[in-house]
Curated annotation (Swiss-Prot):
Spans through the membrane: none
Keyword Metal-binding among record annotations: yes
Region (Disordered): 1-32
Cross-referenced Gene3D superfamilies: Spore Coat Polysaccharide Biosynthesis Protein SpsA, Chain A (3.90.550.10)
Enzyme Commission numbers on file: 2.-.-.-
Family recorded in the similarity comment: Belongs to the glycosyltransferase 8 family.
Biased composition (Basic and acidic residues): 1-31
InterPro entries: Glyco_trans_8, Glycosyltrans_8_dom-fam, Nucleotide-diphossugar_trans
Protein name as it appears in the record: Putative glycosyltransferase HI_0258
Positions bound to Mn(2+): D140, D142, H270
Pfam families: Glyco_transf_8
Keyword terms, alphabetized: Glycosyltransferase, Manganese, Metal-binding, Transferase
Amino acid sequence: MTDRQTDRQTDRQTDRQTDRQTDRQTDRQTDGRTVSQTMNIIFSSDHYYAPYLAVSIFSIIKNTPKKINFYILDMKINQENKTIINNLASAYSCKVFFLPVCESDFQNFPKTIDYISLATYARLNLTKYIKNIEKAIYIDVDTLTNSSLQELWNIDITNYYLAACRDTFIDVKNEAYKKTIGLEGYSYFNAGILLINLNKWKEENIFQKSINWMNKYNNVMKYQDQDILNGICKGKVKFINNRFNFTPTDRDLIKKKNLLCVKMPIVISHYCGPNKFWHKKCSHLNCHIGNLLLKEMDKIIDIPSSWYDHFEKIPFLIKIKRLRKRIKDN
């Protein structure tokens, strides 16, 4: 038996490659449409959010056994963290492309929410950074994927700008706000998870439309790029079940009022709002999984002890391991 055969990462890669070969053989929809063999997923992140980005990526890789290209709209992520994320993706035969974004490009856009970075505005200009792909899934960093993204990826958006889930916090509780930003009579979507038709975005010059909309509603908009996307995409959105973007508000509506029909299983848990999956106060669906994923990642790639400091909900045994890593690092 060779050293290579006993190598943990090689074994995992081999298993993953086998899964993807099987997946490619069945990678067609029942209605006959061919689905792209490579899934394109976009994140936007700065240096501080890199550990959470890695965990979110890992949750996708574990649940979606196929070749994935990850495109990171990169706001000054340092090289060490880039290397860690690249190593994680490579262990599962996936690729990561870091696309430098200059935050000054969006300095005139309003920052109305303290816990949302200006990095989110970068996606308004996606076609500048990402070339030669027709479709992509955009996912916020504050998410954990619970099952395969294949069903989401398969959705036909040929005649739409994007597919998205209703934002029940706005749609159910803030109808008056929609009127304020010109969306009376339209459903309002949460922009944390989007299936994007990049061909349409290029044809319609979405970035210029974003600037025009922002200039008109700058004094009244509250939810940054999410408001902008709702404003410029109204009438061109394919609304999908909230199982693809399950928020704390969705959970509350189901528990208290049963006003929302969500099919099972929940594909993506979205920790929008101030309490994220790495916070002690977070109680949203599967928030504890973030810590477990961090621990599992550490068995696959060597992550720095400082990453554990980013997670408040750390089990006792992981705290011990963190202490040992600090001693070793020093």
